[in-house]
Swiss-Prot record:
Localization in the cell: Membrane
One GO cellular component, as annotated: plasma membrane
Disulfide bonds: none
Protein name: Taste receptor type 2 member 38
InterPro entries assigned to the protein according to its UniProt record, in alphabetical order: TAS2R, TAS2R38
Keywords attached to this entry: G-protein coupled receptor, Glycoprotein, Membrane, Receptor, Sensory transduction, Taste, Transducer, Transmembrane, Transmembrane helix
Spans within the Extracellular topological domain: 1-17, 77-94, 164-190, 273-276
Amino acid sequence: MLTLTRICAVSYEVRSTFLFISVLEFAVGFLTNAFIFLVNFWDVVKRQPLSNSDCVLLCLSISRLFLHGLLFLSAIQLTHFQKLSEPLNHSYQAIIMLWIIANQANLWLAACLSLLYCSKLIRFSHTFLICLASWVSRKISQMLLGIILCSCICTVLCVWCFFSRPHFTVTTFLFMNNNTRLNWQIKDLNLFYSFLFCYLWSVPPFLLFLVSSGMLTVSLGRHMRTMKVYTRDSRDPSLEAHIKALKSLVSFFCFFVISSCAAFISVPLLILWRNKIGVMVCVGIMAACPSGHAAVLISGNATLRRAVTTILLWAQSSMKVRADHKADSRTLC
């Protein structure tokens, strides 16, 4: 199917603004996820045992760092190398494919975190579910290795699917009454096919995430009804744990849906319609979502909150020492 595309230039001001926003998003995303990684990795260096949830957060932060790096490279490609009048260059296509795979690994890790919350917080009555929850708690490291293996398999399949299809271009020119040249161009539809193929692999972890999150929501409602009947204490540790877990899961769901919608919209905008401004908006949305969820994870994790408090106290004391030193030097003068 041929799509009518108007070739329009993007101004220098728009490109500069987009690049500035991309730098800010990359800096915020890199700092938040690097903070999560360093806090958990420091425990590994000190040979302190990491909890299962901390192991998942460690892997999740690594995948987010890759996501932010790829999105920043995508922003540089859009502003400096990829032209509207030309087909997609191979480097930009490679960035898109790598982002899809990293995003899929991110979804698998979120599903793993959701299962872990279910195994810890939900009180099952059925024997099979009790055994399944115990198995999840014991096999979390194997699950993480399985996620890495699945991501590698998906990488190989996506690369094979991408490079095995023949590349073709159909280009025609149409001159309208106002002498506006319109370009009909279909180029590298195999990229779009590979995009859809990779996202099919996201269906199992997404369903797993939805089912486990739904079970956690039902457990929270049941627990709240039990509290209303038997106790009036609002500060219940189990209730607070349920709420914190659901906050992180619901926020991930919202950010993931927004990011996925932006990614789906950006593909036809770039391949068929050649609307670079629309692609820039989509890339900006996709870069903001991982940073937002990282902030939610930091606020809901006790270890990360303590690390933030320690850093803030250190910064405050350092500023106070510098201020006192300047005051003393002025007094001596």
